[in-house]
């Protein structure tokens, strides 16, 4: 099915069992927030007073539930405001996925309004950070982010998604979730 990048983000969150997202919206993340509103019956958004609070809330949620915490912010100062929360999650091995908006891909590297290279900024305090420049790469990148956050030494992973990537459409193939039942107990006679 054809979906926008923003809808793909929401579908991938559902695939990962995410039911709660913490964040603070802004211009570069509005497409994602519009899609998140359409999914509000399945994914609850907790609006915080500040992005730093959102990152700490996602960390606390992960600690309390055992699930991967998710934080969403916009570009520039919105993205840099979550760095302390990511560092905390990294130091304490807490699984967290941060999804940040950014300026459009044609404006990257041009000192555009509220543009910042958040991918490089967070490298010292995350397990990995990714810039998604094509909508076709978005689903696999989000899935990889969750896998990295949850396996080995747990920790935060950041996915930076430019605004045009969230607006563009591509074919989305949902992962088939395989249910593995509990093994049957056998008795030896």
What are these regions (language model features)?
Residues 25, 162, 184:
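Anionic group-transfer/hydrolysis microenvironments
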Residues 1-78:
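Thiamine diphosphate
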Residues 19-20, 63-74, 79-100, 123-175:
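Structural signature of the thiamine diphosphate
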Residues 35-37, 60, 103-124:
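Active-site-proximal loop->helix
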Residues 42-50, 92-109, 124:
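Short, acidic/small-residue loops that bind anionic groups at enzyme active sites
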Residues 178-189:
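Single conserved hydrophobic/aromatic residue that forms the stacking wall/gate
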Residues 23, 49, 73-74, 109-116, ...:
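Alpha-helix capping and helix-loop boundary segments enriched in small/acidic/polar residues
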Residues 38-41, 63-65, 114-117, 148, ...:
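Short, hinge-like loop/turn segments at secondary-structure boundaries
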């Amino acid at each position: 099915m054809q979906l926008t990048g923003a809808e793909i983000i929401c579908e991938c969150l559902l695939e990962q069992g995410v039911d709660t997202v913490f964040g603070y919206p802004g211009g570069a993340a509005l497409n994602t927030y519009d899609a998140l509103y359409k999914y509000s019956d399945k994914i609850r958004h907790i609006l915080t007073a500040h992005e730093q609070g959102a990152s700490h809330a996602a960390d606390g949620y992960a600690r309390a539930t055992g699930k991967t915490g998710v934080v969403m912010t916009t570009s520039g100062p919105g993205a840099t405001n979550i760095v302390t929360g990511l560092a905390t999650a990294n130091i304490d091995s807490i699984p967290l996925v941060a999804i940040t908006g950014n300026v459009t891909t044609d404006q990257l590297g041009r000192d555009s309004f509220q543009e910042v290279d958040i991918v490089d900024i967070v490298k010292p305090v995350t397990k990995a950070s990714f810039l998604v420049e094509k909508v076709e790469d978005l689903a696999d990148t989000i899935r990889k982010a969750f896998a990295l956050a949850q396996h080995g030494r747990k920790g935060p992973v950041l996915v930076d998604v430019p605004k045009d990537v969230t607006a563009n459409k591509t074919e989305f193939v949902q992962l088939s979730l395989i249910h593995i039942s509990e093994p049957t107990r056998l008795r030896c006679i």
